[in-house]
Amino acid sequence: VTAAAPTAPAAGPGRVPGPGPDPGPGAPAPTGRLALVLAPRGGRTVAVRQFHAGALRVLRPHRLDGSGQPCFVVVNPGGGYLGGDRYELDIAVEAAGTALVTTQSATKVYRSPAAPARQDVRLTLGPGAVLEYLPDQLIAYEDADYVQSTTVSMDPSACLVASEVVTPGWAPDGTVFRYRGVALRTEVVMDGTTVVLDNLRLHPAEDAVAGLGFLEGRTHLGSLLVVDPRVDRALVEQVHELLAAAERRLPLLRCGVSELPVPGLVVRALGPGSAELTELLLDVSALLRGRWTGQGRVALRKY
């Protein structure tokens, strides 16, 4: 896969550019848009700018521990994504800020007969910023077609931990892989240069997604992307040992870890269900949190 490297917008010292521009005159409004700019104030990270429109909202942040890190929960009151829908999510964390962002529930994609449902996610991290982006699973139902583009512009000193779990939704005949397509593209940019590019494409009607080289008899897929200057070979080996132990406990799991060209790692896991994969990715996250910040395992409270 090849892609042109975008140029990061200019920003003042210790600050990050704000969320992406509004649609121009005559451009169709997105189905839902949410923009957050987060910055440290008085030892805690707070939202210094917040905007939402259409079918995206964010709940008042709560604190999961005493670290001062806020947890923001993104909500879609519409309940699901339909063909032709377009969502935009912009999150910027300024220098030394820290935040955890999740969703209130799974992202449910329904029939998309004419056009795919799309979501554009733009994450911006300033120097020393920390963002844990841990949404609930993506569920693609029968005839669903979903395209997601995630672009991360981050300072080399920042920390990103981002997860994704893809789940085949229920179909009337009880079979799996009845969705039309799931395409997830993630690009990480540092100093105007693309340093990580991951392009995941699942099209059951065109590819034998259940076969060798794809899901290999499993139905669910999980990924965890970590970009942080503290990642080294020893940490990658620790993660590998954690994954190997998980495979011994749960024989239906298949998982691995790879080191990135920049300090970072990516975990890919196949399994029989979203719960097993979510727990596995949170186990890896807990290892990183314990080593880097002394925080405990993420225990999300959702209402």
Language model segments and positions:
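N-terminal intrinsically disordered, cationic/polar leader segments
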Residues: 2-5, 15, 26-33, 37-53, ...
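N-terminal, charged/glycine-rich beta-strand/loop interface patches
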Residues: 2-137, 142, 149
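Broad gene-expression machinery/nucleic-acid interaction feature
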Residues: 31-35, 69, 86-88, 118-120, ...
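A short, polar/proline- and glycine-enriched secondary-structure boundary/capping micro-motif
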Residues: 57-60, 110-115, 143-145, 171-175, ...
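Short, structured patches in soluble enzyme cores that scaffold and shape functional sites
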Residues: 93-95, 103-105, 125-127, 135-137, ...
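Structural motif
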Residues: 98-100, 130-132, 159-161, 222-223, ...
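A structural signal for small-residue-enriched, beta-sheet-centric alpha/beta enzyme cores
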Residues: 166-303
